[in-house]
Regions:
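Short, cationic-aromatic polyanion-contact patches
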Residues: 1-7, 22, 54-72
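Short amphipathic alpha-helical interface segments
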Residues: 6-19
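A short acidic, leucine-rich amphipathic alpha-helix
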Residues: 25-27
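Key DNA-contact positions within bacterial/archaeal DNA-binding proteins
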Residues: 35
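Short, hydrophobic-biased segments on the C-terminal half of alpha helices
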Residues: 41-42
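A short, conserved structural fragment
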Residues: 45-55
Length: 72
């Protein structure tokens, strides 16, 4: 699957979520390996398209607008 397609699938998945999704949740939803999802999520974070928060052992991800709505 091309990288742009993975990014688009991740963003579409996160748009549907009202609460944070873990890297594992994202990977399962778009049918890729955990580390593939993690790499793309980190890239999207660097592009300021998603926000990241570590809670215990989980990496949690939101779209920026959903994060701002719940965390401010």
């Amino acid at each position: 699957m091309p990288a742009d397609e993975i990014d688009e699938k991740i963003l579409n998945y996160l748009k549907k979520q009202q609460w944070p999704a873990t890297s594992e949740d994202v990977a399962k939803a778009i049918n890729v390996q955990w580390h593939t999802a993690q790499i793309h999520l980190m890239k999207l974070m660097a592009e300021e398209k998603v926000k990241f928060r570590r809670v215990g052992r989980q990496n949690q991800w939101w779209l920026n607008k959903i994060y701002d709505k719940h965390m401010k």
